[in-house]
Amino acid sequence: MNSIIEFPLLDRTTQNSVISTTSSDLSNWSRLSSLWPLLYGTSCCFIEFASLIGSRFDFDRYGLVPRSSPRQADLILTAGTVTMKMAPSLVRLYEQMPEPKYVIAMGACTITGGMFSTDSYSTVRGVDKLIPVDVYLPGCPPKPEAVIDAITKLRKKISREIYEDRIRSQQENRCFTTSHKFRVGRSTHTGNYNQGLLYQSPSTSEIPTETFFEYKSSVSSHELVN
């Protein structure tokens, strides 16, 4: 696993051995080694965090200190299926995090909805429809080594970014905020995809009401059951 991180340039020295750098580089250098994550787990992918806390992978050596309050976190790791009822809560947690903040989407269910999105009308098909995602971590579930690799990639991204550009990009590409209201739109998934071309609309809709009830009254209940 390649864990080499390009740290910001802090080695520009003068004749008096004074280090000179930019405020953006200094901020990135301090943040990439002290990420405080908020763990948002809803299903089996979240169990992999138990392995990360152990001595084998040593979650703390990257400066990661799990927090229970979004106001103290700058990274949120989403793991598991997100339903429509949970969507406002997830967005609210993200909105309460201070800037700059980052998101790691962990597992197939978080990224695409997974197997639960096949026939379910209440599953969010990708957490990036709610909040902006910085690192995608596929798997079902991802191994602890993959989680460490995702954190390493996020640290590389932080070391190269400019804070002003990130804020501007988030404002222009905003996904959803709690101040907005849900709008009832056209359904993109009806659940009838398995029927395909064999699906036919009920023929009774074309029969006049009077004709239908006259036929129903002339046929016994036993014949209707058969």
Curated annotation (Swiss-Prot):
It is a peripheral membrane protein. InterPro entries: NADH_UbQ_OxRdtase-like_20kDa, NADH_UQ_OxRdtase_20Kd_su. It holds the Pfam family Oxidored_q6. GO terms for cellular component: chloroplast thylakoid membrane; respiratory chain complex I. Its cofactor is [4Fe-4S] cluster. The keyword Signal does not apply. It is found in: Plastid, Chloroplast thylakoid membrane. Its EC number is 7.1.1.-. It catalyses: a plastoquinone + NADH + (n+1) H(+)(in) = a plastoquinol + NAD(+) + n H(+)(out); a plastoquinone + NADPH + (n+1) H(+)(in) = a plastoquinol + NADP(+) + n H(+)(out). Belongs to the complex I 20 kDa subunit family. NDH is composed of at least 16 different subunits, 5 of which are encoded in the nucleus. This is NAD(P)H-quinone oxidoreductase subunit K, chloroplastic. It comes from Morus indica (Mulberry). The gene is ndhK.
